[in-house]
Amino acid sequence: MKKSIFLAAVAFMLMSVSASAQFMQSNGGSKAKASVEDVFNTVDLTYSPVTMKASYDGDSATEDLNGLSLNWAQARLLTDQLPVYLQYGAGVQFTWKTDTSSDDYYDVKVKNTTTFLTVKVPVNVLYNFAIPNTNLSVMPYVGLNAQIHVLGQSKTTTTYEDEKETSKMSYFSKDDMEDPYKRFVLGWQIGAMVSYEKYFVGIGYNGPVTSLYKNGDFKIQTSQVNISLGIMF
């Protein structure tokens, strides 16, 4: 299903490019290209609700986490005829979740914190729909996103009366896990940015191509929604 959505998005962008080309040819094209930059950069802060999905033999369970990332990207014009760009960049994302439980009768409190630190390398095809007679542009994109997990761990703190005990487990360490998670994960993404002068907001979705963890029929994959606020220069 998700692969079908990705392919449909690619087809939609190709049809949009073709339609825009015909429109520009019938209307001269020079005015549309006047506002197009050959190269532009973006820097944004992105909040991402992250879903971690575990699947086995047709059954699945999900866990929700929070993600916050700082990202840079550069877009380069691919052709003088159309505002089609190759966009590439890098970002750092911190993902976390905290669960707490307690037993008042025994005076026991348990706090578990899951954290991931991830380097992201996106590569997109982006189209710049400049709205005539305004400073607004709508820029849909579709592409791939490589994720390199630098850190991934679970920290559990148990408090009993005045005593506290802490334990940690790394998801990527063979010392802590017999079959550790994958540090490199590939995903696909689709979204759009709306810019006004040098500012923009963005909304996007990342889906999985490869799994964070896989053992036989059991696998763990992640997906996320991206809500961005940034500047262009």
Model-derived features: where do they sit?
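Transmembrane beta-strands of outer-membrane beta-barrel proteins
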Residues: V39-L45, V84-A90, V119-V121, V138-L144, ...
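Outer-membrane beta-barrel architecture
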Residues: S69-A73, P122-L126, G191-M193, S228-G230
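Transmembrane beta-strands of outer-membrane beta-barrel pores
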Residues: Y47-K53, Q74, A90-T98, L117, ...
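Bacterial Sec-dependent N-terminal signal peptides
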Residues: M1-S26
